[in-house]
């Protein structure tokens, strides 16, 4: 193996880990050669009401697409996260919660969480929620967010969690698409010392003329902030659960019945509702949580992701709770009120496993390691990275400053669509290289292909595809199965196309190189460029807009917008700021352009197609080798854009 920047597994970790390298190779080989036998055995890790006898019916043929796992079994996801632990671990702490203000803290045992979920599940039923109904959840990072999700799962309702940073328009589009009957929110959330007006955002979203399905809005009293009230529609969480029974029978769900919807950005502009089902997802979320983080019973596990993203679903709620872990949930951001907050929380709660994003690591790096002078960190055993590729400098800083050079780092690659981690080191099995996601998890068959779909062997670079299904895979785009087939299975026939590019080195390790479609990754969160462009051109003074990602020291990728104004409109810094606020209002703060360059024209082919590769290079300040411009209708546009670019290094 290439020794360049290689961090070898320590003997102590390998000796005590769930799997060492030899075991990984043996298990991986079995999972590929005999997937039915492998998953028949590992599917038993969760509790089934009616045990499965049929394991796998899958095909990536775009004319005959089929993704079915454990498909004759029945189960309940809520029971797997709660009821199964009550006999032996009712008093174990399930959730440790720390508020935005560190003085606010709560601990909830598995027994208490079970009671809260049962009461709220009965409350949902009292509001007319039935099996198969879609419930929109727009909540702060409080334990009640997990309670709401698990209560939906308990009664067979399908939850659709919307990130608390999204705007009313973004909420409305998701409510309309899912035809939600009930919305669950809070008066306000707290983040970084600021109150977030969640209820007000919901009120504004539900004023959209196309929102016609919502009958009830359940409101958690988090801050006591003033809220407007719609009589007959709005109801307080606490008034519902006060009288609700503590006993709630579980709904028996088929393995392929929907568990949740989660909307993710697409390259076409409209967010797509990723649909995950119950059986395969629960098997995969719990198995990856245990093996990737080498989880040991009773350990304290902290995933810093928001519940509104897939990481919060799989590795803050379903995976860890299915495994009986103690989960730390933090309402705020781990560098507020100072960069020392992350270390203080690790020490205060004796965290054993930390799962966070490169964006946070880079932000802490920029502040300096002096903020960790008082940090002990002796409880920490495993550290993970998620959301985007981590650059080697940030990896090393994370390893040295947070991990004190004794914690393995699992740099995980996966997607909303995959349900769980696909490419990752395993702590006791994988020597790591900073910046590499390394090797596939059990049952995962990655490959690299050229643009014609030919599989590339050996050390090479190409489009990252997957050759066969795994249990956690999404099943469809809600209400638009054709879009599912078109997006993931038409580009390369018989393969799942991830939308990412990757490099494979001489040791077979994978290095993710970033999106190859029109999606950008901002602070580990995916945004469709078409979504941002649509918001910009909806402003009356914007004639045309093109949006690309560019390298950003903190966020990984920033948002760079080229904007052509309507004839006669004057360019100004005031208008630039107005457009930034406009996008913020239309989509949310996450989508706010970092840089807006005025463009008298955009590079287009004679057929009118915008040549984004030129725009990406100019935004990245890579202007010396732009490549062939002969297909452009007006090559002079390029020179003008280069001269007026904003991201100069000089």
From Swiss-Prot:
Keywords assigned: Acetylation, ATP-binding, Ligase, Magnesium, Metal-binding, Nucleotide-binding
The keyword Ligase belongs to this UniProt entry's keyword annotation: yes
Gene Ontology MF term list: acetate-CoA ligase activity; AMP binding; ATP binding; metal ion binding
Enzyme nomenclature, EC number: 6.2.1.1
Cofactor(s) for this UniProt protein: Mg(2+)
Cellular component GO terms held in the UniProt record: cytosol
Modified residues (N6-acetyllysine): 609
Classification via InterPro entries: Ac_CoA_lig (IPR011904), ACAS_N (IPR032387), AMP-bd_C (IPR025110), AMP-bd_C_sf (IPR045851), AMP-binding_CS (IPR020845), AMP-dep_synth/lig_dom (IPR000873), ANL_N_sf (IPR042099)
Binding site for Mg(2+): 537, 539, 542
Superkingdom assignment: Bacteria
Binding locations of ATP: 387-389, 411-416, 500, 515, 526
Residues binding CoA, per UniProt: 191-194, 311, 335, 523, 584
Xref: PROSITE patterns: AMP_BINDING (PS00455)
Post-translational modification, as annotated: Acetylated. Deacetylation by the SIR2-homolog deacetylase activates the enzyme.
Catalysed transformations (reactions): acetate + ATP + CoA = acetyl-CoA + AMP + diphosphate
GO biological processes: acetyl-CoA biosynthetic process from acetate
Family, as annotated: Belongs to the ATP-dependent AMP-binding enzyme family.
General function of this protein: Catalyzes the conversion of acetate into acetyl-CoA (AcCoA), an essential intermediate at the junction of anabolic and catabolic pathways. AcsA undergoes a two-step reaction. In the first half reaction, AcsA combines acetate with ATP to form acetyl-adenylate (AcAMP) intermediate. In the second half reaction, it can then transfer the acetyl group from AcAMP to the sulfhydryl group of CoA, forming the product AcCoA.
Protein name: Acetyl-coenzyme A synthetase
Species classification: Bacteria, Pseudomonadati, Pseudomonadota, Gammaproteobacteria, Alteromonadales
């Amino acid at each position: 193996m290439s020794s360049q920047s290689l961090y070898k597994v320590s003997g102590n970790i390998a000796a005590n880990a769930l799997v060492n390298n030899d075991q990984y190779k043996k298990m991986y080989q079995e999972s590929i050669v005999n997937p039915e036998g492998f998953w028949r055995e590992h599917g038993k890790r969760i509790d089934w009401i009616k045990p499965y006898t049929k394991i796998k019916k899958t095909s990536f043929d775009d004319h005959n697409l089929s993704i079915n796992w454990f498909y004759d079994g029945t189960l309940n996801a809520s029971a797997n996260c709660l009821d199964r632990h009550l006999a032996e671990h009712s008093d174990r702490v399930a959730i440790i919660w720390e508020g935005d203000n560190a003085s606010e803290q709560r601990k909830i045992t598995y027994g208490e969480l079970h009671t809260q979920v049962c009461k709220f599940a009965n409350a949902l039923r009292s509001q007319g929620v039935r099996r198969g109904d879609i419930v929109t959840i727009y909540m702060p990072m409080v334990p009640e967010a997990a309670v709401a999700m698990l209560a939906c799962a308990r009664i067979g309702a399908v939850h659709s969690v919307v990130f608390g940073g999204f705007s009313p328009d973004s909420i409305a589009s998701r409510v309309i698409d899912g035809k939600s009957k009930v919305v669950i929110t809070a008066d306000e959330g707290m983040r970084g010392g600021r109150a977030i007006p969640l209820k007000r955002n919901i009120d504004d979203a539900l004023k959209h003329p196309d929102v016609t399905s919502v009958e009830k809005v359940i409101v958690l009293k988090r801050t006591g902030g003033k809220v407007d009230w719609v009589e007959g529609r709005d109801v307080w969480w606490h008034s519902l659960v006060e009288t609700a029974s503590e006993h709630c029978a579980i709904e028996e769900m088929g393995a392929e019945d929907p568990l949740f919807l989660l909307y993710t950005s697409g390259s076409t502009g409209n967010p797509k509702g990723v649909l995950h089902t119950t059986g395969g997802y629960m098997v995969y979320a719990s198995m990856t949580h245990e093996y990737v983080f080498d989880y040991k019973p009773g350990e304290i596990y902290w995933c810093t992701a928001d519940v509104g993203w897939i990481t919060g679903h799989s590795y803050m709620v379903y995976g860890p709770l299915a495994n009986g872990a103690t989960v730390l949930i933090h309402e705020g951001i781990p560098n507020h009120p100072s960069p020392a907050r992350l270390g203080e929380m690790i020490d205060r709660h004796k965290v054993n496993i930390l799962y966070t994003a490169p964006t946070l690591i880079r932000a802490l790096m920029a502040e300096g390691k002096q903020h960790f002078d008082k940090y002990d960190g002796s409880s920490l055993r495993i550290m993970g990275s998620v959301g985007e590729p981590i650059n080697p400098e940030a990896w090393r800083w994370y390893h040295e400053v947070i991990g004190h050079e004794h914690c393995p780092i699992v740099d995980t690659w996966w997607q909303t669509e995959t349900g769980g981690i696909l490419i990752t080191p395993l702590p006791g099995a994988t020597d790591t290289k900073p910046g590499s996601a390394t090797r596939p998890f059990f049952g995962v068959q990655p490959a690299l292909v050229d643009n014609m779909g030919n599989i590339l062997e050996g050390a090479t670079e190409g489009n990252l595809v997957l050759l066969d299904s795994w249990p956690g895979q999404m099943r469809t785009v809600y209400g638009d199965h054709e879009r599912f087939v078109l997006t993931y299975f038409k580009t390369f026939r018989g393969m799942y196309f991830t939308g990412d590019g990757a490099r494979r080195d001489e040791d077979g390790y994978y290095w993710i190189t970033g999106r190859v479609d029109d999606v950008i990754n901002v602070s580990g969160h995916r945004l469709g460029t078409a979504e941002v462009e649509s918001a910009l051109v909806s402003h009356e003074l914007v004639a045309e807009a093109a949006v690309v990602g560019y390298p950003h020291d903190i966020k990984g990728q920033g948002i760079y917008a080229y904007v052509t104004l309507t004839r006669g409109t004057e360019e100004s810094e005031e208008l630039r700021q107005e457009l930034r606020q406009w996008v913020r209002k239309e989509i949310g703060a996450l989508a706010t352009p970092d840089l807006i360059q005025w463009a008298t024209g955009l590079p287009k082919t004679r057929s009118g197609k915008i040549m984004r590769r030129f725009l990406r290079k100019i935004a990245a300040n890579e202007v010396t080798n732009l490549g062939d411009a002969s297909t452009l209708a007006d090559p002079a546009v390029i020179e003008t854009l280069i001269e007026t670019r904003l991201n100069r290094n000089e």
